[in-house]
Amino acid sequence: MSRSKRDNNFYSVEIGDSTFTVLKRYQNLKPIGSGAQGIVCAAYDAILERNVAIKKLSRPFQNQTHAKRAYRELVLMKCVNHKNIIGLLNVFTPQKSLEEFQDVYIVMELMDANLCQVIQMELDHERMSYLLYQMLCGIKHLHSAGIIHRDLKPSNIVVKSDCTLKILDFGLARTAGTSFMMTPYVVTRYYRAPEVILGMGYKENVDLWSVGCIMGEMVCHKILFPGRDYIDQWNKVIEQLGTPCPEFMKKLQPTVRTYVENRPKYAGYSFEKLFPDVLFPADSEHNKLKASQARDLLSKMLVIDASKRISVDEALQHPYINVWYDPSEAEAPPPKIPDKQLDEREHTIEEWKELIYKEVMDLEERTKNGVIRGQPSPLAQVQQ
């Protein structure tokens, strides 16, 4: 595309303290959220004749961590296509060359709210179990591609008014380190599993702890473990669930183990005490049964020792969830990730920038009428 023609395709609009320079097809931009990764606007796509969400990545080349995360997100969004993972519609940059390249805009399906808003509502068992079922389907699909999220939280899960749910991002790269001792809180970590905050090894069911925290918050309308830092969070976990057994302590790194073993010992509370009947809809025998099933599922997800925690497959077959089971959703074919070493890659910022630029150019080339060619369209799901 020539320089002048490219210039003519874009216009700029001020959104808070940021300038969005977007393709002219995207009109009526309105800010709907912001986070560590960038600012998100709702917009109207005049070509697709539908509302979309546009995310401007925040300083993608500020450092190697930002650049790696931007590259990982683009590669994975391009490959993953599942009804419970947010759909990629378009990617673009207003800059005209690698030398000028500094902004990345990602266009996605627009949803109605994130789970933070839904958590404040009184949900019946049908809605709660359906939301959890969809969460588990999305997580299982990521796991099938070798993607373990590790950072699920209400703010990165979105819903529509018809109760459909989608996961917004792909979590922490496998190489993203975490440190237990005095780690400052840069982002919300209330939903991260004990094995993450204690710097242990982890497997897929690390994400089931996060689902348990989210489900518990749906029931109680409050954050279960709102720690000020990792140490405070660990204390809140053991105060409620009890100090884990010596067998668990043996798995910890020596410095962490010394600290954890020297904490006061807690017996913890029963799940009947933590999640009493009064918190659930229980106005019929059916609802009383459902409350019992919900509590049982919570007790299997909120287990400190990951070796004793439920797996995503077991959760999908749990009586509280399996009423929704559909093989086309829960057993969808795994996405093909071309770069198997995605999380292990290390580059300079300039090398990351070039890799990201190539991805954006490739996606621009593959985009026709706003939908990425070479993968099933998320629009097909919207129109079903």
Curated annotation (Swiss-Prot):
Motif TXY, chain ranges: 183-185
Binding site for ATP: I32, G33, S34, G35, A36, Q37, G38, I39, V40, K55
Main location: cytoplasm
EC number, UniProt record: 2.7.11.24
Free-text tissue specificity from the UniProt record: Brain (at protein level).
Subcellular compartments: Cytoplasm; Nucleus; Synapse
Positions bearing Phosphotyrosine: Y185
Positions of post-translational S-nitrosocysteine modification: C116
Keywords: ATP-binding, Biological rhythms, Cytoplasm, Kinase, Nucleotide-binding, Nucleus, Phosphoprotein, S-nitrosylation, Serine/threonine-protein kinase, Synapse, Transferase
Induction field: In T-cells, following T-cell receptor (TCR) activation. Levels peak 48 hours after TCR and CD-28 costimulation.
Regulation of catalytic or functional activity: Inhibited by SERPINB3. Activated by threonine and tyrosine phosphorylation by either of two dual specificity kinases, MAP2K4 and MAP2K7. Inhibited by dual specificity phosphatases, such as DUSP1.
Positions where Phosphoserine occurs in the chain: S377
Protein modification: Phosphorylated by TAOK2. Dually phosphorylated on Thr-183 and Tyr-185 by MAP2K7 and MAP2K4, which activates the enzyme. May be phosphorylated at Thr-183 and Tyr-185 by MAP3K1/MEKK1. Phosphorylated form is more concentrated at synapses than none-phosphorylated.
Pfam families: Pkinase
Complex formation: Binds to at least four scaffolding proteins, MAPK8IP1/JIP-1, MAPK8IP2/JIP-2, MAPK8IP3/JIP-3/JSAP1 and SPAG9/MAPK8IP4/JIP-4. These proteins also bind other components of the JNK signaling pathway. Forms a complex with MAPK8IP1 and ARHGEF28. Interacts with TP53 and WWOX. Interacts with JAMP. Interacts with NFATC4. Interacts with MECOM; regulates JNK signaling. Interacts with PIN1; this interaction mediates MAPK8 conformational changes leading to the binding of MAPK8 to its substrates.
Record function comment: Serine/threonine-protein kinase involved in various processes such as cell proliferation, differentiation, migration, transformation and programmed cell death. Extracellular stimuli such as pro-inflammatory cytokines or physical stress stimulate the stress-activated protein kinase/c-Jun N-terminal kinase (SAP/JNK) signaling pathway. In this cascade, two dual specificity kinases MAP2K4/MKK4 and MAP2K7/MKK7 phosphorylate and activate MAPK8/JNK1.
Stated family: Belongs to the protein kinase superfamily. CMGC Ser/Thr protein kinase family. MAP kinase subfamily.
Protein's name in the database: Mitogen-activated protein kinase 8
Source organism: Mus musculus
Gene name as annotated: Mapk8
